[in-house]
Curated annotation (Swiss-Prot):
It is an enzyme of class 1 (oxidoreductase). Mn(2+) binds at D148, E150, E219. HAMAP family: DXP_reductoisom. It holds the Pfam family DXP_reductoisom. Catalyzes the NADPH-dependent rearrangement and reduction of 1-deoxy-D-xylulose-5-phosphate (DXP) to 2-C-methyl-D-erythritol 4-phosphate (MEP). Its cofactor is Mg(2+); Mn(2+). This is 1-deoxy-D-xylulose 5-phosphate reductoisomerase. Transmembrane segments: none annotated. GO terms for biological process: isopentenyl diphosphate biosynthetic process, methylerythritol 4-phosphate pathway involved in terpenoid biosynthetic process. Pathway: Isoprenoid biosynthesis; isopentenyl diphosphate biosynthesis via DXP pathway; isopentenyl diphosphate from 1-deoxy-D-xylulose 5-phosphate: step 1/6.
């Protein structure tokens, strides 16, 4: 039995993680969970899974929870510290970090200090502070197990292989909601159109990131840290069907690929059961004859400028990826609220990157300060 702490239980990854836990009551038990402010979603989860600890970001949600009559005694906390409390909860073996945004960084570090196995779905943890997280993981001898389908695919392809034999990583990308549109057609696109992803069921922020290809850019930075591979050896390949989740090419030009129908529960479950596997009854088998053909296209950095920003930020390193991430979070939020157009997301990010003076080897405090400065700068443009 593995005891789970789930950070971000009411989000897309959180809900699919709960589905995996639900299908394997003999293997997993939810001991702790956190959520933001969606108390209507949280209460049924608490009642079904009966975690010992529940944390929420919103004080209002916390008071609603406190006023609810549960059939058992549950510990509760509110605010930013709640994620940390859940991450270091004593009875937990595995922490699933399904938080969205840079808020996921500190809970990850605290969980590593307590030698919890990390199942990482929060890209921003490695994007903003990859050098610190990797050093923590090495110091405390804690595995970082990827939950993203692309990184899980690479992780699976590398089982039994030696890192020294890797030629390059090939990270696949669906192309997002606007993959069939020319760049000139993007100016007037709506939020509703952007949120209509052709392949995956995801949260709003990551769906917009997929449309701009920033999501893939963040995944490139994440892959750099997870697998210790230079950016020059990480390629992005457009693949509309999302059947090949990623590939690894070795020095002898052999290529290993991991395939499957688009279902986030598969990589989530693999992270929870690793190094074993378990049946996933509701997952669909891959019948290639039904698909007929798979399509591929080279990523166009002029078409997807956010992908270019991510590669350049990663190569520069230091605090630049933290700026990239903070500016993107602010810009995407502004787009979702109707304050900027789709293409203005790129413009805001570029302005933030161009004004930043990089700190080469930042401390955690430096990263926090740069994050806040960047958000304040973008906000000053928006107001």
């Amino acid at each position: 039995m593995r005891y789970i702490s789930l950070l971000g239980a009411t989000g897309s990854i959180g809900e699919q993680t709960l589905d995996v836990i639900r299908q394997h009551p003999d293997k997993f038990k939810l001991k702790a969970m956190t959520f933001g402010r969606n108390v209507d979603k949280a209460i049924p989860i608490i009642e079904q899974f009966q975690p010992e600890f529940v944390g929420c970001l919103s004080e209002e949600a916390y008071h609603t929870l406190k006023g609810h009559s549960f059939e058992y005694d549950v510990k509760m906390a509110a605010g930013d510290e709640a994620n940390i409390e859940a991450a270091i909860y004593d009875a937990v073996d595995v922490v699933v970090n399904a938080l969205v945004g840079s808020v996921g960084l500190v809970p990850t570090l605290k969980a590593i200090e307590q030698k919890k196995t990390i199942a990482l779905a929060n890209k921003e943890t490695l994007v903003t502070a990859g050098h610190i997280v990797k050093e923590y993981a090495k110091t405390y001898d804690v595995p970082l197990l990827p939950v993203d389908s692309e990184h899980s695919a690479i992780f699976q392809c590398l089982q039994g292989e030696q890192a020294k034999n890797i030629e390059r990583l090939i990270v696949t990308a669906s192309g997002g909601s606007f993959r069939d549109k020319k760049r000139t057609e993007l100016e007037g696109v709506t939020v509703e159109e952007a949120l209509n992803h052709p392949n995956w069921s995801m949260g709003a922020k990551i769906t917009i990131d997929s449309a701009t290809m920033m999501n893939k850019g963040l995944e490139v930075i994440e892959a750099h840290w997870l697998f210790d591979i230079p950016y020059e050896q990480i390629d992005v390949l457009l693949h509309k069907e999302s059947i090949i989740h990623s590939m690894v090419e070795f020095h002898d030009k052999s290529v290993m690929a991991q395939l499957g129908t688009p279902d986030m529960r598969v990589p989530i479950q693999y992270a929870l059961t690793y190094p074993d596997r378990a049946p996933l009854p509701e997952a669909k088998s891959l019948n290639l004859w039904e698909i007929g053909q798979l399509n591929f296209q080279k990523a166009d950095f002029d078409r997807y400028r956010c992908l270019h920003f991510a590669y350049e930020s990663g190569k520069i390193g230091g605090t630049m990826p933290a700026v990239l991430n903070a500016a993107n979070e602010m810009a995407v939020d502004a787009f979702l609220k109707g304050k900027v157009t789709f293409l203005q997301i790129e413009e805001l990010i570029e302005k933030a990157l161009n004004r930043h003076h990089v700190i080469s080897t930042p401390s955690l405090q430096d990263i926090h300060e740069v994050d806040k400065e960047t958000r304040d700068f973008v906000q000053s443009i928006l107001t």
